[in-house]
């Protein structure tokens, strides 16, 4: 009887208001702590409240948090849209979309000055015995929810790497107030590429293809890594046409979609190959009408979603525009971009300068840029590595104040003549830190997109790049071993973290020296 009473008391003792300067890794406890908020324990779990006015992605993230709490403690947390009364509820909401949070803000019980109006920021604190996760925007709230999931012991890689969850009888959130500011790199994401036969075969067997069932897991992984951007698989796939639910799911969950460097106007290359006879030759100089019509359909289809539109034009597929000198191709490219922006303005009903766009300075396109080709100031310049993990240029000083900013397209997977580098991780963490730090320090900080091939076996470099993109200042050159140990501890075993980190470090180092697939 005494034991049962103690168990009930432990999970009804909510923490007293307080503010600490830092929450850190120890903000979740696995044993009772006076003044702490009890998430779950001994057959009980706090309800998670999401307002009906909030984003669907917030509700989906809350459902996952409830499931994660169940994985850790054995007791799943329910999600409710009913307005919470009393104490003991996790209230997750976006400023302006959660009645209870907005009410407490007006009453001065929550100070949101540190996150209000900021990009992807969140705070966590208690109010009147409830745990509040308040986001500045949709992804701010979602990141706050998944941040708590990670802290209770659920790895972002729980699905794609089968990372087990360590069980605990109770979960507590320590007293204090935690504020997470905006990321240093605005858009952070991956490109699923060179995906056949490995990822494509698995996705077809497991889900029936690259459909919304498959992408739900990919989007969740990205959000758990605090990433927000993606180029979808495209070798034999059309993201919007293979499953019409794909685009809506991405927008609901909070993922900004784009298309690769040779797929303009939100049209996967497969869209064109299926319509080659209808559209006509992929030659703007001779088939402007057919290609413009193709572009219009892409703009109309994606206009209701959060997207970054790739503009420009290369050849039919991942090749250079053919049939002329650089100067002649540059003249055609100028007409292409002018036409694309006219289409965007017409379809969206506003100045194209207000529509996020990027121009990829990739392979032969960099020659055009070096020869003086310019795009409007509001268009992001996406610089690229040399396909082997070395950036080709740091941010040019003359571009550092451009309105559209600068981004980086980087390969940790490569498929192209004369060599492939696809199925073995050959990228070391120190090299990644060096190259991305060069980009960041030179002002290339608006978007980082990484070609990750089949996703597996590139878990480690993906994890590092996404975390580094959030705050490059947090991992210094002499701290990469610390990161590796932390990664090993989270995804394998604390008892063996040092040994695992050493093995993984040497494995990638030896592979970098020889590039086994290239031999």
Question: Where are the language model's segments positioned?
Answer:
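Contiguous, structured surface segment used for ligand recognition
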Residues: 23-182
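Substrate-binding groove of N-acetylhexosamine-processing glycoside hydrolases
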Residues: 176-179, 313, 340-519
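Flexible loop/turn segments at secondary-structure boundaries
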Residues: 56-57, 98-99, 140-141, 197-200, ...
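Hydrophobic or amphipathic alpha-helical targeting/insertion segments
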Residues: 95-97, 123, 127-165, 241-267, ...
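Bacterial Sec-dependent N-terminal signal peptides
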Residues: 1-29
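Gly/Pro-rich turn-and-neighbor structural signature
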Residues: 79-81, 166-172, 234-235, 241-252, ...
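An acidic-aromatic substrate-binding cleft motif
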Residues: 155-208, 213-233, 404-407
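The substrate-binding groove and active-site-proximal loops of carbohydrate-active enzymes
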Residues: 56, 132-135, 193-212, 227-237, ...
